[in-house]
Amino acid sequence: MRMNFSTMATAGLLLAALVTTTPRARAFDGNEDGEDDNKSYAIGLWGDLPYSAGQAIGVKNLIADMNAQRLAFTAHDGDLKAGSTVCLDTVYTDALGYFNSLKAPAAFTPGDNDWTDCDRTAGYSSLAQLDHERLLFFNTSYTLGQKKLRQDVQATPLCLGFGGTSVPCVENRRWTYGKVTYVTLNIQGSCNNLCDTLPDAAEFAARNAANIAWMKLAFSEAKKNRSSAVMIISQGNPGFDATDSTRGPVRNATTLAEANAATDGFKEFLLALRAEVAAFAKPVSYVHGDSHYFRVDKPFLNATGQRLENFTRVETFGDNQQNGNNDVNWVKVFVDPNSREVFAYQPQIVPANRTAVPLP
């Protein structure tokens, strides 16, 4: 439980840290050693891990597998634990250890299990936990990892912290690597904090507005910089159509209306995203976790029912223990700024984690 500090002090600490902290590892902007912006590279995506002690062992194997490959950076799309377990300090310190054991820069965006759902345990505050994550994982303008990557930060105090005071949305990041713009957004499962144990409409409204503004700015910067593509990384599955029922909201694909409008924490964002995707006209990849179901598809339609061909949804592997398969694996993305689609996706089944079908 972390309710013994003022949110205003937290905001000040965050802003001061972003200005004054020097990363311990070497940092760089975009491409390493002056590499050509047009050069192809690969990144690693993972999330919704670990949910158990067994998966924690699998995560170490996953990290070793990532470290054995040449990656420009990695990104974890949130959920460091199961939603039903207590938000103990060790959850976050263990995660920090995982991220900093990665050789490549390690980007991260929080998950609902990390903060939104923490109030399922008496005495725990969702916003106190989010404040703790902001201080632990986002106290500089760089990624985590043994090598650091410089990021732009949404430092304007648009979000809410513990006590309801406005604080910087420092978890929202943006960076450019090889002519591609990347952006993280604090978008959550549990109806984006509008359902579950203690819904918080005020917190949602502030963060939702901040997310939309940060997303729009990312597309504006991508256009200004003539980026070849945009990749958005968040936790929650917003639901894109009537078939997306695997823990995601089911909605009308053209109106984007959800059946239960009272707890729809995504429609306003999706409407804004759809407009930006159409206007950008170049490849857009939307990476999320939440549903624990690896997939790459094109579920986004415009208001007249036409598919937005330049939009691809990527859901990373995640906890799948209920089906007897832990799915402690990751997704390798090949990025070629000069190719037509820019992104190519390849699931990586970690050899040391194979149990159902062991290696021959």
Residue ranges and their predicted role:
Residues M1-T10:
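Bacterial N-terminal signal peptides that target proteins for export
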Residues R26-V91:
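N-terminal active-site segment of His-dependent metallophosphoesterases
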